[in-house]
């Protein structure tokens, strides 16, 4: 018996040796596995940063609005963000009002700069081929809406743009020129489907240029979101001694004005009597 026990004890280390030799270390994790394993930690850190920033923003906005923080201890995240947006808008209006009181031409400069940028975008889209027509129309319509909102912007102590005196005509008998910091040119709407002005040739467009912005004789045609088109007329075209009466062209080619008559009630006006701003 003792011999058998000694034999078993002596053989047990030898039997365990091959098992320990055959063990292999764990394979290193790939980049995707590492990102997957660390994603919960990163998400936790991200939420902690958001909550910390919102907490600081809450303290700042309550101090700026001079509100008691004890009464607003349970503000939701959306409420904090809305209060911040409103406060920043009020600050922006106050800064614009202060700037206008110092220099009344600030708003005019802003409008002139926006109008110039809009003209550059329209000119690029009019001459660039391969641009999707739907995207082009949506972009030009969005810019036209923004231009309308900017023209309607008023601040305390400043008259409405519609009540302001028209800008003086540019000096010299040359073509239409924009004076420095002049307000944006007016838009003359034309019903959808109207024929383009025959006085000028359109610039180079893509295959679907019929629905995009065009330039005829120096005047830009901007499509509106409701399917109509509008002429972008320079200020120099309105430098007349008498009042200017806009004339709209319909699909039939007849003019519609204060003295116009329908084809059924009387003879239509001739082509010479139609006012064409794109002709000198």
Swiss-Prot record:
Residues covered by the bHLH domain: 34-91
Compartments reported by the entry: Nucleus
Protein's GO biological process: adenohypophysis development; amacrine cell differentiation; artery morphogenesis; ascending aorta morphogenesis; BMP signaling pathway; Cajal-Retzius cell differentiation; cardiac neural crest cell development involved in outflow tract morphogenesis; cell adhesion
Biased composition, class Basic and acidic residues, residue ranges: 26-35
UniProt keyword annotation of Repressor present: yes
Pfam families for the chain: Hairy_orange, HLH
Bias (Low complexity) ranges: 10-21
Stretches with biased composition (Polar residues): 254-271
InterPro entries: bHLH_dom, HES_HEY, HLH_DNA-bd_sf, Orange_dom
A single Gene Ontology CC term: nuclear matrix
Keyword terms, alphabetized: DNA-binding, Nucleus, Repressor, Transcription, Transcription regulation, Ubl conjugation
Keyword field contains Ubl conjugation: yes
Record PTM: (Microbial infection) Ubiquitinated via human cytomegalovirus/HCMV protein IE1 that assembles a HES1 ubiquitination complex; leading to HES1 proteasomal degradation.
One example GO MF annotation: protein-folding chaperone binding
Entries under SUPFAM superfamilies matching the protein: HLH, helix-loop-helix DNA-binding domain (SSF47459), Orange domain-like (SSF158457)
Motif (WRPW motif): 275-278
Comp. bias regions, Pro residues: 164-174, 181-200
All copies of domain Orange, residue ranges: 110-143
Subunit structure: Transcription repression requires formation of a complex with a corepressor protein of the Groucho/TLE family. Interacts (via WPRW motif) with TLE1, and more weakly with TLE2. Interacts with HES6. Interacts with SIRT1. Interacts with an FA complex, composed of FANCA, FANCF, FANCG and FANCL, but not of FANCC, nor FANCE.
Role noted for this protein: Transcriptional repressor of genes that require a bHLH protein for their transcription. May act as a negative regulator of myogenesis by inhibiting the functions of MYOD1 and ASH1. Binds DNA on N-box motifs: 5'-CACNAG-3' with high affinity and on E-box motifs: 5'-CANNTG-3' with low affinity. May play a role in a functional FA core complex response to DNA cross-link damage, being required for the stability and nuclear localization of FA core complex proteins, as well as for FANCD2 monoubiquitination in response to DNA damage.
Comment text on domains: Has a particular type of basic domain (presence of a helix-interrupting proline) that binds to the N-box (CACNAG), rather than the canonical E-box (CANNTG). The C-terminal WRPW motif is a transcriptional repression domain necessary for the interaction with Groucho/TLE family members, transcriptional corepressors recruited to specific target DNA by Hairy-related proteins.
Designated name of the protein: Transcription factor HES-1
The species this protein was found in: Homo sapiens
Gene name for this UniProt entry: HES1
């Amino acid at each position: 018996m003792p011999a058998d026990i000694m034999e078993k004890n002596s053989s047990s280390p030898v039997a365990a040796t091959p098992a320990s030799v055959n063990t292999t270390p764990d394979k290193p994790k790939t980049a995707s596995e590492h990102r997957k394993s660390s994603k919960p930690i990163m998400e936790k850190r991200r939420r902690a940063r958001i909550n910390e920033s919102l907490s600081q923003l809450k303290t700042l906005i309550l101090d700026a609005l001079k509100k008691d923080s004890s009464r607003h201890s349970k503000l939701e995240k959306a409420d904090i963000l809305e209060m911040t947006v409103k406060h920043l808008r009020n600050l922006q209006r106050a800064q614009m009002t202060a700037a206008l009181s110092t220099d009344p031409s600030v708003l005019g400069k802003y409008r002139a700069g926006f109008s110039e940028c809009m003209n550059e975008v329209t000119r690029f889209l009019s001459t660039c081929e391969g641009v999707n027509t739907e995207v082009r129309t949506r972009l030009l319509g969005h810019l036209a809406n923004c231009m309308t909102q900017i023209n309607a912007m008023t601040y305390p102590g400043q008259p409405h743009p519609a009540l302001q005196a028209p800008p003086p005509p540019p000096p010299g008998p040359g073509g239409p020129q924009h004076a420095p910091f002049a307000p944006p040119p007016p838009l003359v709407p034309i019903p959808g489907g109207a024929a383009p002005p025959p006085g000028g040739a359109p610039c180079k467009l893509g295959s679907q240029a019929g629905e995009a912005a065009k330039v005829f004789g120096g005047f830009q045609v901007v499509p509106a979101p409701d399917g109509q088109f509008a002429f972008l007329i320079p200020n120099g075209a309105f430098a007349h001694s008498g009042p200017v009466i806009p004339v709209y062209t319909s699909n039939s080619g007849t003019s519609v004005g204060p003295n116009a008559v329908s084809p059924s009630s009387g003879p239509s006006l001739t082509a010479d009597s139609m006012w064409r701003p794109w002709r000198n």
